[in-house]
């Protein structure tokens, strides 16, 4: 037992909220492969035996067909996760990945192939205009900053030199905290 975290971009989180959930806790292990369908404030465990050996795109297509909407957001582990490969990812909408801590393997250990969310509620914001203004300002500042541009183009590896110099670069699963020459990585 340990704790871990991982985050991914995309729209799965907002869709989960619009489906009526802030969070979901999974306990135990299913006897057979399953996926969780969440919509309209209800959660339903569905048999996933028919999709357990499919690739990610086929799984997403099958779940969307079953739920009757192309708007369904799917977070899933792949075959590596179902086989409990320790560094397996979770992908949502085939382009955003929770790659840290092997959470795909955690899903596989529970025989959980996917979580599918279809929102039916609108998100409510206390001050929507403030949120919009803040998002625009953040985006503008980010685009104008050369580091922000590097982050957009190269991802988090843009910070490899800075992190290495600070002794905060995770190398070999944190066995080391810097590289002798981080420049080629950045």
Where in this protein do the model-derived segments appear?
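Intrinsically disordered, low-complexity segments enriched in small residues
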Residues: 1-7, 11-186
């Amino acid at each position: 037992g340990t704790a871990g975290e991982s985050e991914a971009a995309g729209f799965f989180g907002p869709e989960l909220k619009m489906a009526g959930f802030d969070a979901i806790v999974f306990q135990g292990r299913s006897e057979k492969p399953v996926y969780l369908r969440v919509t309209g404030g209800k959660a339903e465990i569905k048999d996933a035996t028919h999709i357990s050996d499919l690739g990610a795109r086929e799984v997403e297509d099958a779940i969307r067909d079953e739920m009757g909407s192309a708007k369904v957001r799917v977070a899933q582990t792949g075959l590596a996760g179902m086989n409990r490969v320790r560094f397996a990812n979770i992908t949502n909408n085939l382009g955003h990945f929770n790659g840290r801590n092997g959470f795909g393997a955690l899903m596989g250990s529970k025989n959980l192939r996917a979580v599918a969310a279809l929102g039916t509620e609108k998100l409510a914001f206390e001050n929507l205009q403030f949120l919009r203004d803040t998002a625009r300002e953040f985006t503008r500042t980010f685009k104008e900053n050369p580091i922000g541009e590097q982050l957009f183009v190269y991802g988090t590896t843009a910070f490899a030199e800075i992190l290495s110099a600070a002794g905060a670069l995770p190398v070999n699963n944190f066995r080391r905290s810097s590289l002798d020459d981080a420049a080629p990585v950045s």
